[in-house]
């Protein structure tokens, strides 16, 4: 599936919602926060850094289609070059397993983080979102109640599009601002955390807050600037970051 990027004319109209710092975590109607289970689809630098970050405090299952990567992860060896990931896998008591079986991993997850590749073809001017949609389809088959968080790079307008395509409200978006080879470090010391959600849906706003809480819980940095906003605004923030 190819999706052509949309462009927003008036950036001044963006409405950004700041997440107020709270003493208590926000809970979803799922497991207690401490017992939340996460599945991560994709073990490139985005997916693996998120999986490593969250596995400090939660059960995380990393899903990939390459057997060699799964085998390495289950032997606490990083399949990618990242000093912090290598160190954490070797030295930290992470609650992390890897599997080729996405359906099984997603079936028991509260959150499914989608970090599948979305290659951009500059000549044809589109993102190949087929890998993202393959994950969404498998999650809908095995666990339609899971909250899916797209971390892949996507064009402006895509989250609303895919929610409509699959008639699924459980899809939100959280842009990443990571450097390759320093991805876990950038998650431990994030410049900001942004989650795009449906601001009219109280349940999804809670889901966005809870996902932001998961990221903050795993980080070393304190007082992280955290923003909850609409899907399009979050996608545009990522577009701006990539452009400038």
Placement of each model-derived feature along the sequence:
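NAD(P)+-binding Rossmann beta1-loop-alpha1 motif at the extreme N-terminus of oxidoreductases
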Residues: 30-77
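Internal alpha-helical scaffold of NAD(P)-dependent oxidoreductase catalytic cores
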Residues: 30, 163-174, 179-244
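Rossmann-like NAD(P)(H) cofactor-binding subdomain of soluble oxidoreductases
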Residues: 120-182
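A structured beta-alpha segment of the ubiquitous adenosine-cofactor-binding alpha/beta core
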Residues: 85-110
């Amino acid at each position: 599936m190819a999706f052509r990027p949309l462009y927003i004319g008036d950036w001044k109209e963006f409405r950004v919602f700041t997440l107020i710092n709270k003493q208590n975590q926000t809970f979803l109607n799922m497991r207690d926060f401490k017992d939340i289970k996460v599945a991560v689809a994709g073990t490139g630098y985005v997916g693996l850094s998120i999986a490593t970050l969250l596995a400090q405090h939660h059960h995380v299952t990393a899903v990939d289609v390459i057997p060699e990567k799964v085998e390495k992860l289950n032997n606490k060896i990083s399949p990618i070059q990242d000093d912090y990931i290598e160190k954490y896998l070797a030295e930290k008591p992470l609650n992390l397993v890897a599997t080729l079986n996405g359906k099984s991993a997603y079936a028991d997850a509260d959150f499914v983080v989608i970090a599948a590749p979305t290659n951009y073809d500059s000549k044809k001017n589109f993102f190949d979102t087929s890998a993202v949609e393959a994950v969404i389809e498998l999650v809908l088959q095995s666990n339609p109640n899971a909250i899916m968080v797209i971390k892949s790079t996507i064009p402006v307008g895509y989250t609303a599009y895919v929610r409509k395509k699959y008639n699924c409200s459980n899809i939100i978006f959280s842009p990443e601002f990571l450097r390759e080879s320093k991805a876990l470090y950038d998650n431990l010391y994030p410049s900001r955390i942004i989650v795009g959600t449906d601001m009219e849906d109280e349940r999804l706003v809670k889901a966005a807050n809870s996902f932001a809480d998961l990221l903050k819980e795993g980080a070393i940095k304190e007082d992280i600037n955290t923003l909850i906003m609409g899907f399009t605004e979050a996608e545009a923030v990522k577009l701006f970051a990539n452009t400038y």
